[in-house]
């Protein structure tokens, strides 16, 4: 077959070895990250006075980023934007985010490690691809770089090693990049690498294993309650993500002294934690998620956690936002469950995924991640809640715009068409205006083609004089 002859066998062998190597390296990367961050968290909880060092540790983190020649403001959302544009990722990002996350956690910053694993995975995946001199498997496409492919593989593998959810990890990285680099072959490659990473990491007992919950039977009343939790989770998740993104965008444009921001906010976080006894809200928050599953939380605990996460990540402390997002969603779901008489553990599970979908604008990844974490029994509830979570929230979150599903696109087209007709003064006027614009476009296209033809003629005969338009029209 012709497509077989187009395959570069050497590159194919390199790709197979690369897939396995990324899986292995990503697994041990996640293991190292977990050991370091978990140690920092244990020290913070054992020696509560470390919270007073949070401002100093934040400044030290920014100094380390400067030494690594990275932007003070660089975070996961910046990396996602680079992935969407197929730009390379700095190899120094892996050690920088590892050190930054550990220092933030040591001082009591409300940050996680999953997004840090994303950044480390992207950096490692791309660095390995350069060492392999990796190119496209197909000979006629070897002029295209593979930065995005290699980085996505590292991202999905490291995330899978933390959550032991290969499908959710792969769909998350593709969804974050709007499926721009998606192909069946790449999907399989990323999935194999993610499975390898999860299989290696699992026996070590690392990662954040969200406890499974009992899933009730499907009833009309329960479905309505799930719709309510999903809708509110999506709306509040989107609001949280967009607010955090807006603050970070403002900092990039307006903030000239990032050290001052970390110092002032770090002092503020320290005062809040000490004054109100919020030590349990420090770090990623897995302890809070376990409490939510048992129903032993306060009604407004989700708001407290969201506030501390917003202050830490919004001011420039380094760390992940994914685990805190899941925790906030779980706390919100548990609170809503208590209000509407739904099992707290089940409500926590629905809240986790719907808030995550609203914040990231990744409903497909939330669906697969949800049933991998909570089991296939949750699928009908998950599907319904995520549809309402995505539909109720605006098409923008922490990572910018999400994928455009049909109902979003159709609704936007309908709104634009209605506005166009109203501005034109009716359907007939709108059609006439469209015809006029089409004629203008055709004329402009014809003039551009004529100009290009003249340019080509002059290029082929430099001595030729440009034609006289007036003479040609006479």
Where are these regions (language model features)?
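Alpha-helical transmembrane segments and immediately membrane-proximal extracytoplasmic
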Residues: 1-474
